[in-house]
């Protein structure tokens, strides 16, 4: 997972840097054309994959029933439930800040496309550093504490980002946020996969993936709408403060969460739904 994060965030670091140059020297349309061309390479790689193992097919089940079972399982788990709830709040409250970079780069810092490229690339660079650090971390013990601590770091970094008018101070803030986001993302995914019953793993990870992808988008839309009335800073700052509040609430459950998330699920089973 750490290697996957390194690859993903390397692209996130290099992509905006290239896009900034293409937009500045050619046009926005040219940047989209280059982006589309990269997907062709991905499709060719997918078509050339061979020898994948066949997975056993279980009894068919309706999507609604399978989703309901996953929700019940997650809500009854003393580690997964608070982790997913905190992750939901923080993804909506803080992680959409990357989608707001165009507004900050132009309206707040007055840097235009090149400033946008620098902000996005700095987040990606921080994410790579976080992934490399997680790659060198050998054990799952203590991972719950690490994830919760860096969840707070994200919120504090975003608060500092919204409080400054200086571009040179904003860059370290987004670097720190990018580092913490990757550490929490890899850490939470590792804990969930380790703790969940194998029969529910796919559905729980799908729930995690839905939160991971939809949360920032929902947060960006919500904060973008509020920014028309309150400006860019206040909605993002309030989202970070709400995330801090949920972090404090979840922190009280850290010991119990660690006992279940860092243990073998066969040793500490969760009562199955139904």
Q: Where on the chain are the PLM-derived regions?
A:
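Alpha-helical transmembrane-bundle signature of multi-pass membrane transport and export proteins
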Residues: 1-274
């Amino acid at each position: 997972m750490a290697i996957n994060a390194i690859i993903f965030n390397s692209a996130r670091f290099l992509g905006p840097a290239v896009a900034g140059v293409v937009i500045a020297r050619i046009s926005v349309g040219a940047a989209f054309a280059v982006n589309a061309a990269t997907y062709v390479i991905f499709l060719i790689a997918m078509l050339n994959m061979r020898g994948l193992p066949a997975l056993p097919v279980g009894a068919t089940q309706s999507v609604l029933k399978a989703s309901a079972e996953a929700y019940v399982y997650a809500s009854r788990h003393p580690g997964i439930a608070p982790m997913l709830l905190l992750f939901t709040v923080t993804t909506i409250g803080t992680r959409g800040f990357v989608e707001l970079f165009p507004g900050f780069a132009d309206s707040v810092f007055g840097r235009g496309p090149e400033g946008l490229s620098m902000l996005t690339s700095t987040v990606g660079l921080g994410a790579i550093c976080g992934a490399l650090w997680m790659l060198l971390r050998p054990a799952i013990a203590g991972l719950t504490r690490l994830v919760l601590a860096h969840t707070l770091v994200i919120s504090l970094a975003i608060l500092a980002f919204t409080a400054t008018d200086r571009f040179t101070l904003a860059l370290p803030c987004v670097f720190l946020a990018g580092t913490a986001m990757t550490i929490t993302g890899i850490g939470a995914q590792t804990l969930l996969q380790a703790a969940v019953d194998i029969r529910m793993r796919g559905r729980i990870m799908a729930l995690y993936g839905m939160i991971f992808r939809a949360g920032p988008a929902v947060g960006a839309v919500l904060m973008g709408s509020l920014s028309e009335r309150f400006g860019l800073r206040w909605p993002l700052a309030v989202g970070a403060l709400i995330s801090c509040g949920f972090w404090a609430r979840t922190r009280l459950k850290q010991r119990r969460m660690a006992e279940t998330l860092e243990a073998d699920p066969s040793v500490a089973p969760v009562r199955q739904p139904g």
